[in-house]
């Protein structure tokens, strides 16, 4: 059964359905990002959360990814991480919790892996509190 989040937007049932709906140019870009994240954290589980593919580890969200009309985004869900990598992220549009990049030009794999690993450390630190 399809879940709806509003009258006009159907939430994808799973990550594969999300990718099937994405236009090809964005899908290719997002698949590269997805592959990099999987390599950085192979034990992560992919789910749909807030209508986007989300990588979770130990039931805690690490990062979300999304495709939009003219760009793709990586959502580290952490302003602290964006500040920590501010210099490396300078070529990209960033906001409070988003790294936006053009279609066909994903964020370098080494930087994505740093962000993901930093999110793992953040989640582990929160768990200890």
Identify the function of each model-found stretch.
Residues 1-129:
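Charge-dense, helix-prone N-terminal extensions
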């Amino acid at each position: 059964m399809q879940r709806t989040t509003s009258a006009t937007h159907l939430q994808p049932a799973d990550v594969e359905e999300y990718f099937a709906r994405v236009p090809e140019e964005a899908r290719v870009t997002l698949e590269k990002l997805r592959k990099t994240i999987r390599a950085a954290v192979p034990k992560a589980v992919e789910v749909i959360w807030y209508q986007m593919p989300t990588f979770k580890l130990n039931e805690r969200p690490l990062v979300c990814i999304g495709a939009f009309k003219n760009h793709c985004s990586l959502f580290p869900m952490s302003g602290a991480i964006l500040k920590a990598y501010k210099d490396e992220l300078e070529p990209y549009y960033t906001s409070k919790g988003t790294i936006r990049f053009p279609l066909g030009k994903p964020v370098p794999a080494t930087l994505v892996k740093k962000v993901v690993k930093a999110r793992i450390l953040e989640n582990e630190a929160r768990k200890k509190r």
